[in-house]
Amino acid sequence: MLENLSTEHRNEKTMNLDEMSIKEVLQSMNEEDRTVALAVENEIEQIEKVVQTVIKSFEEEGRLIYIGAGTSGRLGILDAVECPPTFGTDDKMVQGFIAGGLKAFTKAVEGAEDREELAEEDLKSIGLNEKDTVIGIAASGRTPYVIGGLKYANSVGASTASISCNKNAEISKYAKLNVEVETGAEILTGSTRLKAGTAQKLVLNMISTASMIGVGKVYKNLMVDVQSTNEKLIERSKRIIVEATGVSYEVAAEHYEKAERNVKAAIVMVLLQCEYGEALEKLKEAKGFVKKAL
């Protein structure tokens, strides 16, 4: 029942929200937002287990699939689409599905989140299998679309996890791993796009970033698999080579082009003073980890 969910309770501190000045509203929001990171901290051990599961999927050439409705679905898609430019993944490695399809990203599709079968159809469309990890996201922890997706994922042997913002969430019953970030009452009653949405974004950031580190997409704290899809990223790529190797900008730019704009290969070429082909071979042997290639 909705009334039993902490995310649906009224916030005692903001009972007179409509009478507050703009500054008071903003201060109240800021005060409440400060509690979110602490709530996430309480779930670090569970998030770690999820990351380990995702890394295992990636190592077996499986995928990470997010499913959610409304804000939760949009946040999953947002995290997924950032992975190719940031970590050089293909667009299949991390995917996001939202109840009602992509059109629901910009406009609500009424009733879609209440249909369990829609998630099963979405997951069947990509040939979900036992190598994949499915993460169901729902602030309330009770969204039928997410429950349906988790049920189907379990039926094909995929790994499953859930992210919710209430304790003892319904979706936790259908996932092998559960992250329950208790964010409590929102300043605007029931508006879970606020603290709950912020908490979900923080958790998704952790999962995707830590998982990519775990499969060699990062060297030191540099995103060495960045894709040079625009001028800003081309410039960033050269700067990453400078930071990783200590060479001048000119030398970095030269190796960047010699390595056919492969940042990892350019770094290995500079540090081992080798040719492009040898750098690629060393990276292949090291399964993409720059540190191991060196």
UniProtKB/Swiss-Prot annotation:
Q: Name one Pfam family in it.
A: GKRP_SIS_N
Q: What is its EC number?
A: 4.2.1.126
Domain SIS, first and last residues per copy: 54-217
How does this protein assemble? Answer: Homodimer.
One Gene Ontology molecular-function label: carbohydrate derivative binding
Pathway(s) annotated for this protein in UniProt: Amino-sugar metabolism; N-acetylmuramate degradation
In its UniProt entry, what is this protein called?
N-acetylmuramic acid 6-phosphate etherase
What does the UniProt record say this protein does?
Answer: Specifically catalyzes the cleavage of the D-lactyl ether substituent of MurNAc 6-phosphate, producing GlcNAc 6-phosphate and D-lactate.
- Known catalytic reactions: N-acetyl-D-muramate 6-phosphate + H2O = N-acetyl-D-glucosamine 6-phosphate + (R)-lactate
InterPro entries recorded for this chain? Etherase_MurQ, Glucokinase_regulatory_CS, MURQ/GCKR, SIS_dom, SIS_dom_sf
Additional remark text = A lyase-type mechanism (elimination/hydration) is suggested for the cleavage of the lactyl ether bond of MurNAc 6-phosphate, with the formation of an alpha,beta-unsaturated aldehyde intermediate with (E)-stereochemistry, followed by the syn addition of water to give product.
Active-site residues per Swiss-Prot or TrEMBL entry: E82, E113
Keywords attached to this Swiss-Prot or TrEMBL record, sorted alphabetically, are: Carbohydrate metabolism, Lyase
Keyword presence, Lyase? yes
**Main EC class the enzyme belongs to:** lyase
- One GO term of the biological process aspect: N-acetylmuramic acid catabolic process
Q: Which family does it belong to?
A: Belongs to the GCKR-like family. MurNAc-6-P etherase subfamily.
What gene does the UniProt entry assign to this protein?
murQ
